[in-house]
Design a protein with these regions (language model features):
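N-terminal Sec signal peptide and the immediately downstream disordered periplasmic leader
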Residues: 1-74, 78-82, 234-235, 716
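Conserved C-terminal beta-signal and adjacent last beta-strands/turns
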Residues: 14-15, 197, 235, 247, ...
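Short acidic/polar hinge/loop motifs at secondary-structure boundaries
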Residues: 116-117, 124-150
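Transmembrane beta-barrel wall of Gram-negative outer-membrane proteins
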Residues: 177, 184-213, 218-256, 281-303, ...
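Face-selective signature of the C-terminal outer-membrane beta-barrel domain
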Residues: 239-247, 284-437, 462, 519-525, ...
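Surface-exposed extracellular loop regions of Gram-negative outer-membrane beta-barrel proteins
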Residues: 252-267, 372-379, 427-438, 447, ...
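Membrane-embedded beta-barrel scaffold of Gram-negative outer-membrane proteins
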Residues: 293-295, 303-321, 462, 468-474, ...
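Gram-negative outer-membrane beta-barrel transporters
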Residues: 349-350, 419, 522-529, 547-643, ...
Length: 717
């Protein structure tokens, strides 16, 4: 084939990758990060072996530090990952709850925290063994990159891996460097940051701290948060290194405005339900963790990596459960106090070599994680005084642990073909010891064991150096979390050990292209079929119970394109279409116990709530190293059902943001400043939803037009 014809073929593939899905997304269509220039040597590690995303048979995106920090508040991860296709990240404007994250529909049902998606910060799991996670302890001011892995290969991370999000701190600078930043804006938002980095006498260090506070967009939504993060790196003369990571989070008080009903959302989106004020709904969190990573190269072909970590997290949450509802002897109260001790290890061996003259990479390892959680419940009143800690109503020690051996390999079969395969054997154990045995509230101790074998295989074909095709298939599983096990149906006490894990079969087909003229593009088609999906059974009195209910299907298309022109002009487009439905019908209820007459049938074919069928993202940025810079971005999100019965949904929304700034040098200092506007068209929309909220308060409003002004200064000695 002559060069002209080959070039024409490549251009047709690239343009087809963009145009065909764009037509399919005319109704609703989500995003990927603005990265470095096309053909830049970008490397990711989400598959446990360093490789370029272009050479991996999986959907994977890398968000760099410039995207994370340029013109941003650096408060929530949702600011940075909005451009990743298949990933829906929502800022709930409620710091008593974590950012709402779902990947290809996994995690969408979570009413608080993050579930269905595995989270890691500097290699340390931010997801507990039960599958429940949080990511509020990330200091974005010292973050180097975020990697997002979607599709079948996520299962190699074990339980609850509908997707994998990994956050990595900066590596130590070669010269001592200090950095200071401040940003402030609408609704009393203020963020202060400081960082020191350098290398001296064989020790590399990055030490950072940030403080954030806000009055909140809505009434009763003020919050304050302080994060500290330190990364220390020691090298030795034998090809090894030790990295110590220390992280702390302090959230002394975050008011919880709760959700709003459709009527409340329409009349006063900044308002709050009266019950939030009556009971002073709020949350506080205190967390400290430390991890150690030991990397040792044995020889040219073999390396070992050992991770050890431990941490402690205290959480206290005051809810708005009415006094009368807590009258029953089996009710656990309206205050939840959790004291969590967690620890774990991951030992990994990597071998690189050649077989039949073809290169291969083999990774084998063993992961163990454990959580001990003391769950105590209290009444949220004393006499006629509401919103205070009252009488003890629950006291138990819950433990969850996993023990997972895993192995994966990539073999280059020829100059064009490569095959990647892996397997993980996941064992998850739950135990509960009841310490509150009073009257008719008997001993509710119990245990459960879950296990699954999770195979994955993928193949990649290099059509030429600019176009790669791939296909991947795998199996995943998702156990119930401790929060989903916490309450038994029909008012019974004890954990709901009748719940079983959901099991999924995943398939993905994709094409990746890169061109110096046309930029980088990806297109992925995927389908996930799940059996024994965990869904809501009842939701009443501030408590949700769950059940296994038949089958679901998640089918969709993701497309992304990015390019850099004239070195500094960066353009990006990302699209997602996701059809997530229940394949089987089931019953749900808004009262406990749930008599048959009160049950509502969720019809087969209903959409899974919390998931937009389509979303689209586009951005254009002028980003020279020094001088004036600016960017504009737009995001369109389709309607989002709020419950399993699909009785209501958020309206479609289009949100536009823009920022302009300047970067310069002055007497050895690098100085920068910016101003940013979000929702500059002042659209009214729901930024997130509380799925299956029992009182009909589904809607969490997003702010109107907001402004942010920020500046930073750094100096390298």
């Amino acid at each position: 084939m002559d060069k002209r014809r080959c070039s024409t073929t490549r251009r047709a593939v690239v343009i087809g990758t963009l145009v065909l899905p764009a037509a399919a997304f005319a109704q609703d269509a989500a995003p990927r990060p603005a990265g470095a220039a096309s053909l830049a040597p970008v490397v990711v590690t989400a598959t446990r072996a360093e490789a370029a995303p272009f050479d991996i048979p999986a959907s994977i995106d890398r968000i760099g530090s410039e995207t994370i920090r340029d013109g941003r508040a650096q408060v929530n991860i949702s600011e940075s990952v909005g451009g990743v296709p298949g990933l829906l990240a929502r800022d709930r404007q409620n710091y008593a709850q974590d950012v709402q994250i779902s990947v290809r529909g996994f995690g969408a049902r979570s009413t608080f925290g993050i579930r269905g998606v595995r989270l890691y910060v500097d290699g340390i799991p931010a997801t507990f063994p039960d599958g429940q996670g949080q990511i509020s302890n990330v200091d974005l001011g010292s973050t180097d990159r975020i990697e997002v892995l979607r599709g079948p290969f996520s299962a190699l991370y074990g339980n609850s891996s509908g997707g994998v999000i990994q956050v990595f701190s900066e590596e130590p600078a070669t010269r001592p460097t200090v950095d200071f930043s401040i940003a402030g804006g609408s609704d009393g938002v203020v963020r202060l940051g400081a960082k020191a980095s350098g290398t001296a006498a064989g020790l590399g260090y990055v030490v950072a701290a940030s403080h954030f506070r806000t009055d909140g967009y809505r009434d009763h939504s003020a919050a304050e948060r302080t994060i500290g993060n330190a990364k220390l790196k020691f090298g030795n003369d034998t090809g090894g290194s030790i990295t110590v990571i220390v992280n702390s989070l302090n959230l002394p008080r975050a008011q919880d405005p709760l959700g709003l009903t459709r009527a409340q959302f329409g009349s006063d989106p900044r308002g709050v339900d009266a019950s939030a004020l009556q009971f002073d709904t709020r949350k506080n969190v205190d967390q400290t963790q430390v991890g150690l990573i030991y990397d040792q190269r044995i020889d040219a072909a073999n390396a070992l990596r050992l991770l050890i970590y431990t941490g402690h997290r205290n959480t206290t949450q005051f809810q708005s459960i009415p006094v009368a509802t807590q009258a029953g002897p089996l009710h656990p109260g309206g205050v939840i106090a959790l004291s969590s001790d967690y620890r774990g290890t991951d030992l990994r061996w990597t071998n690189r070599g050649r077989v039949a003259e073809q290169p291969y990479t083999l990774v084998a390892g063993l992961a163990y994680d454990t959580l001990e959680q003391r769950r105590v419940g209290y009444q949220n009143f004393v006499g006629t005084t509401l919103g205070v800690q009252g009488a003890l109503r629950r006291d138990e020690l819950d433990t969850a642990s996993d023990f997972d051996p895993y192995a994966q390999a990539t073999v280059q079969l020829s100059t064009r073909w490569s095959v990647s395969a892996g397997v993980r054997r996941s064992h998850v154990r739950f135990d509960s010891v009841d310490h509150y045995i009073v009257g008719t509230n008997g001993n509710d101790s119990g245990s459960a064991r879950y296990a699954a074998t999770l195979p994955v295989i993928g193949a990649l074909f290099a059509l030429d150096e600019h176009v790669h095709l791939y296909a991947t298939a795998g199996r995943g599983f998702e156990t119930p979390t401790l929060n989903e096990l916490a309450y038994s149906p029909n008012g019974a006490t004890g954990l709901n050990f009748a719940l079983r894990p959901a099991k999924s079969d995943n398939l993905e087909l994709g094409v990746k292209t890169r061109s110096a003229d046309l930029g980088d593009a990806t297109l992925a088609l995927f389908e996930t079929r799940t059996q024994q999906e965990i869904v809501t059974l009842t939701n009443a009195g501030g408590r949700s119970t769950f059940q296994n209910a038949g089958a679901t299907r998640r089918r969709g298309v993701e497309a992304a394109w990015s390019a850099t022109y004239a070195q500094n002009l960066r353009a990006q487009i990302a699209l997602t279409y996701l059809d997530a439905i229940y394949r089987d019908s089931f019953l749900t209820c808004n009262i406990t116990p749930c008599p048959a007459a009160s049950a509502q049938r969720v019809a087969a074919g209903n959409r899974i709530p919390g998931v937009a069928r389509g979303s689209a993202y586009a951005s254009l940025a002028w980003a020279p190293v020094f001088g004036w810079r600016g960017a504009v971005d737009a995001r369109r999100t389709g309607m989002v059902p709020v419950n399993d019965t699909n009785s209501d949904a958020t309206p479609r929304s289009i949100v536009v943001g823009a920022n302009v700034g300047y970067v310069g040098r002055f007497d050895g200092w690098q100085l920068s400043g910016f101003v940013r506007g979000d929702n500059v068209l002042a659209k009214r929309y729901a930024g997130s939803v509380i799925v299956n909220e029992g009182n009909g308060r589904f809607f969490e409003p997003a702010p109107g037009r907001t402004w942010l002004l920020g500046t930073s200064a750094s100096y390298a000695f």
